[in-house]
Amino acid sequence: MSEEEIFNKIKDLIADNFEVDKDSITENTNFMNDLDADSIDLVEFILQLEDEFGAEIPDDEAEKIKTVGDAVSYIKSHQG
C-alpha cells in the first residue's frame, strides 16, 4: 500500500472519529492540539489503526504517534 493510500485511509478514520472535514486534515495535524483528542480518544484511534491495517502497535510506539504524519510513517514502515 502506498503512503498516499495509507494517508487517505487514516484521513477517513479521523474524519469519522473526530468529526472534522477530511480536507482539513494534513500530515501535520496534531491529534491533541488540532483535533482536541484526549488519551482515551487516542487509544481508541490506535485500536482502529490496528484493525484497519492489520498491524499491532505497541504502547511505547503508540505514545510516539502525535501527528497524522507519524501514524502514516508508522503504518508504512510496519506493513506486511
UniProtKB/Swiss-Prot annotation:
Pathway: Lipid metabolism; fatty acid biosynthesis. GO terms for cellular component: cytosol; membrane. It comes from the Bacteria. One of its GO terms (biological process) is lipid A biosynthetic process. Residues 4-79 form the Carrier domain. One of its GO terms (molecular function) is acyl binding. It is found in: Cytoplasm. 4'-phosphopantetheine is transferred from CoA to a specific serine of apo-ACP by AcpS. This modification is essential for activity because fatty acids are bound in thioester linkage to the sulfhydryl of the prosthetic group. Its main location: cytoplasm. The modification O-(pantetheine 4'-phosphoryl)serine is found at residue 39. Keywords: Cytoplasm, Fatty acid biosynthesis, Fatty acid metabolism, Lipid biosynthesis, Lipid metabolism, Phosphopantetheine, Phosphoprotein. It holds the Pfam family PP-binding. Carrier of the growing fatty acid chain in fatty acid biosynthesis. NCBIfam families: acyl_carrier (TIGR00517), PRK00982.1-2 (NF002148), PRK00982.1-4 (NF002150), PRK00982.1-5 (NF002151), PRK12449.1 (NF009104). Belongs to the acyl carrier protein (ACP) family. This is Acyl carrier protein. It comes from Lactobacillus acidophilus (strain ATCC 700396 / NCK56 / N2 / NCFM). The lineage of its organism: Bacteria, Bacillati, Bacillota, Bacilli, Lactobacillales.
